[in-house]
Amino acid sequence: MTQWEVVIGIETHAQLSTVSKIFSGASTAFGAEPNTQACAVDLALPGVLPVLNKKAVECAIRFGLAIGAEVAQKSVFARKNYFYPDLPKGYQISQMDLPVVVGGNITLQVGQGDKAYEKIVRLTRAHLEEDAGKSLHEDFHGKSGIDLNRAGTPLLEIVSEPDMRSSDEAVAYARALHALVRWIGICDGNMQEGSFRCDANVSVRPKGQAEFGTRREIKNLNSFRFMKEAIDFEVQWQINEIEEGRKIQQATVLFDPDTGETRMMRSKEDAHDYRYFPDPDLLPLMIPAEWIARVQGEMPELPVQRRERFAGDLGLSAYDASALTASQEIADYFEAVVAIAGKANAKPCANWVMVDLAARLNKDGKDIADSPVSAAQLAGLIQRIADSTISNNIAKKVFEALWNGEGATADEVIDKQGLKQITDTGAIEALVDEVLAANAANVAEFKAGKEKAFNALVGQVMKAAKGKANPQQVNDLLKQKLAG
């Protein structure tokens, strides 16, 4: 039976965070009334000329530096010719033979736990281009409306090599790229508004075969979950087609989230179908070394550098370091917690940020920037766990109280609610003696080899202590008494 290998390459359109469009002064703000943010250049009125947005070029330079690519000192804009109702000029200004960014790579963390591994995905190129307008179909009863607000919005199209071999790797790549463009401040990453959208080129081939299979491009994937579902379906569809003796035809397909299936949109075009040629209205883009050096000096610490620091300086696992650098806001919050709680508590700090805080933020639909529990408050809570003032279970109650604004600090909540842990050995021993005397059956079961009986006794002691006894001391004292 043939063993199949999946081959995936991804093209990503990242909308650049500029105030105005790439070749005009019209606003890029999202959500305005249709056709209220389209000027003469965007409408392609006769006689208008494009003027390149300097900020868009700087965004491209930042990206190139972030992925270790070559930032071309000379690049050329080209006309990509095709007809579509929401493309007024009849062509899109893009780049073809001489893009602004060439090469580079992104390092991914794929999977979790024992199955986690690191993978490097190479990038082919990244080039600047303008977005098209938008066709609206819902409200026009057999007709289509055209909204040109989006026309001319600056995009950076990022093209990967076909280095991914599973939907998990593709999603890990998309997540890493999404985090990076947000981290370096060139794109807000809002997938619902179309600021970050991916096309996945998918093919299959027999394992061991060097030649690529025929690819089909899944267009406009605007969520990581849909990306995984779409690729998984497409892979199985292609395998079934080949095994039933049919040939795969190169095509562009769409993913339907309602059915979980891909459906053909059109046969796939090649570059020659677009008749690219240099745009005569735009001079070649020249980027001097001094400009690149200036942008380099303004670059923040990158996610990969921060991951290495978290792993090296704080002893975190590769998975934890990767999760904590999913966004700059998360990484900054975590570092602020560690700065107060101390490096010795780095692992519990990581756990609280990644698990408890993340779950509560997700439940309430909040971003970490809007967390009701500040980094200082969380650090204070972790310090009280570390010095045995409270147990982990009690800490969860304190966290909820802080979240709900029931105290300014962990200490205040602990004092107000009388949650301080009982660490007095004599007091805990008295509770243990009471529980052993009242639970002879559990004692007998434990001595007969039933480990569950021990857990039941621990639970009884904690219940008697109203959850405030030090769990380790309870365990130790029970073992001593039962061994005697």
From Swiss-Prot:
Keyword ATP-binding attributed: yes
Entry superkingdom: Bacteria
One GO term (biological process): translation
Catalytic activity annotation: L-glutamyl-tRNA(Gln) + L-glutamine + ATP + H2O = L-glutaminyl-tRNA(Gln) + L-glutamate + ADP + phosphate + H(+); L-aspartyl-tRNA(Asn) + L-glutamine + ATP + H2O = L-asparaginyl-tRNA(Asn) + L-glutamate + ADP + phosphate + 2 H(+)
InterPro entries (alphabetical): Asn/Gln-tRNA_amidoTrfase_suB/E (IPR017959), Asn/Gln-tRNA_Trfase_suB/E_cat (IPR006075), Asn/Gln_amidotransferase (IPR018027), Asn/Gln_tRNA_amidoTrase-B-like (IPR003789), GatB (IPR004413), GatB_C_1 (IPR042114), GatB_Yqey_C_2 (IPR023168), Gln-tRNA_amidoTrfase_suB_CS (IPR017958)
GO molecular function: asparaginyl-tRNA synthase (glutamine-hydrolyzing) activity; ATP binding; glutaminyl-tRNA synthase (glutamine-hydrolyzing) activity
Record keyword Nucleotide-binding present: yes
Enzyme Commission number, as recorded: 6.3.5.-
Entries under Pfam families matching the protein: GatB_N, GatB_Yqey
Family: Belongs to the GatB/GatE family. GatB subfamily.
PANTHER family for this protein: GLUTAMYL-TRNA GLN AMIDOTRANSFERASE SUBUNIT B MITOCHONDRIAL AND PROKARYOTIC PET112-RELATED (PTHR11659), GLUTAMYL-TRNA(GLN) AMIDOTRANSFERASE SUBUNIT B, MITOCHONDRIAL (PTHR11659:SF0)
Function in brief: Allows the formation of correctly charged Asn-tRNA(Asn) or Gln-tRNA(Gln) through the transamidation of misacylated Asp-tRNA(Asn) or Glu-tRNA(Gln) in organisms which lack either or both of asparaginyl-tRNA or glutaminyl-tRNA synthetases. The reaction takes place in the presence of glutamine and ATP through an activated phospho-Asp-tRNA(Asn) or phospho-Glu-tRNA(Gln).
UniProt cross-references to NCBIfam families, sorted A to Z: gatB, PRK05477.1-2, PRK05477.1-4, PRK05477.1-5
Name recorded for this polypeptide: Aspartyl/glutamyl-tRNA(Asn/Gln) amidotransferase subunit B
Biological source species: Dechloromonas aromatica (strain RCB)
Underlying gene: gatB
